[in-house]
Amino acid sequence: MAPESLVEVPGCNCFWYLGVLAAAWWGLRAACCLLNGARAWVLGSGAQVGPRIGKWAVVTGATDGIGKAYAEELARRGMSIVLISRSPEKLDEAAKHIKETFKVETKIIAADFGKPTEIYERIEAGLRDLEIGVLVNNVGVSYEYPEYFLEIPDLENTLDKMININIMSVCQMTRLVLPGMLGRGKGVILNISSASGMYPVPLLTVYSATKAFVDFFSRGLHAEYRNKGINVQSVLPFYVATKLAKIRKPTWDKPSPETYVRSAVNTVGLQTQTNGYLPHAIMGWISTSLVPVSVAISMGMKMNKGLRSRFLKRKKQK
């Protein structure tokens, strides 16, 4: 009888090989992530974005935050800018600043994407005959504060508004601009989603779902049209110091819109789905690769319950 230490345990070789394969797989994934990261964050220059793909860039939600920063960055790269937003006064001010600072042409179209009746006919007329190289679908709206679905103030109107602004505007603006890009065989569409669309976020459920739509729509559209010269990118920022996020002072992980956009534009052509900014990319990798979705949802619920309580407490004190 063979000594116990020499007895072969059935299947032990199989488990060893499985372990080696798993380690090799994770090693390969890590290497690919590092390689793609270096390509985007070190070598990226956004060379695909500029007047050579079309004279004009169209930016929705162009008078504040990330939209304004995209308009200015594209103007800095030599593109003429069509600014679309709700307030004619803020549009005039933003257009004047861009024209004087970057010496490019500007055009403004006042439109309230929350009230879509007939606005797309007006936008289509305003864009007619323009050589549009870049479309930035940025306009968006979120909750005033985290809230349970059935307790959202003015729920019916809020749903209509959020779906019209966050989803329908992306589809409709793409419908208007994409044919011209296809006709020339080149163009870039940048759809601003959110890190909230990477996994469900309780108490921001509708907003999170609309941003997940933008991400899926972008990636599907890119697969449909990439062989025809069209580059569609889904941009998923974490917190940026904007009015929408209610953050006033930029930090390393909550950058100014200008810092964020300068970084994000450099990833165009290198990443079809991007968090746009290196610290955000690290947070995105951790939250989707290392943290189980169930844990991310639980953490989101806990954080937003705290934010909700603090908001309602302040409101009651007023």
UniProtKB/Swiss-Prot annotation:
Residues noted as binding NADP(+) in the record, renumbered to the chain: 54-83
Pathway(s) it belongs to: Lipid metabolism; fatty acid biosynthesis; Steroid biosynthesis; estrogen biosynthesis
Gene3D superfamilies on file: NAD(P)-binding Rossmann-like Domain
InterPro entries referenced in this protein's UniProt entry, alphabetically: NAD(P)-bd_dom_sf, Sc_DH/Rdtase_CS, SDR_fam, VLCFA-Steroid_DH
Keywords linked to the UniProt accession: Endoplasmic reticulum, Lipid biosynthesis, Lipid metabolism, Membrane, NADP, Oxidoreductase, Steroid biosynthesis, Transmembrane, Transmembrane helix
Pfam families in the record: adh_short
Subcellular location: Endoplasmic reticulum membrane
GO cellular component terms, semicolon-separated: endoplasmic reticulum; endoplasmic reticulum membrane
Membrane topology per record: Multi-pass membrane protein
GO molecular function: estradiol 17-beta-dehydrogenase [NAD(P)+] activity; oxidoreductase activity; very-long-chain 3-oxoacyl-CoA reductase activity
Active-site residues, Swiss-Prot/TrEMBL: 207 (proton acceptor)
Class of this enzyme: oxidoreductase
GO annotation (BP), single: fatty acid biosynthetic process
EC number: 1.1.1.330, 1.1.1.62
Catalytic activity entry: a very-long-chain (3R)-3-hydroxyacyl-CoA + NADP(+) = a very-long-chain 3-oxoacyl-CoA + NADPH + H(+); 17beta-estradiol + NAD(+) = estrone + NADH + H(+); 17beta-estradiol + NADP(+) = estrone + NADPH + H(+)
Residues passing through the membrane, by range: 15-35, 187-207, 281-301
Sites where the protein binds substrate: 194
Function: Catalyzes the second of the four reactions of the long-chain fatty acids elongation cycle. This endoplasmic reticulum-bound enzymatic process, allows the addition of two carbons to the chain of long- and very long-chain fatty acids/VLCFAs per cycle. This enzyme has a 3-ketoacyl-CoA reductase activity, reducing 3-ketoacyl-CoA to 3-hydroxyacyl-CoA, within each cycle of fatty acid elongation. Thereby, it may participate in the production of VLCFAs of different chain lengths that are involved in multiple biological processes as precursors of membrane lipids and lipid mediators.
Family of this protein: Belongs to the short-chain dehydrogenases/reductases (SDR) family. 17-beta-HSD 3 subfamily.
PANTHER family the UniProt entry points to: RH59310P, VERY-LONG-CHAIN 3-OXOACYL-COA REDUCTASE
Name of the protein described by the UniProt record: Very-long-chain 3-oxoacyl-CoA reductase-A
Organism listed in the record: Xenopus laevis
Source organism phylogeny: Eukaryota, Metazoa, Chordata, Craniata, Vertebrata
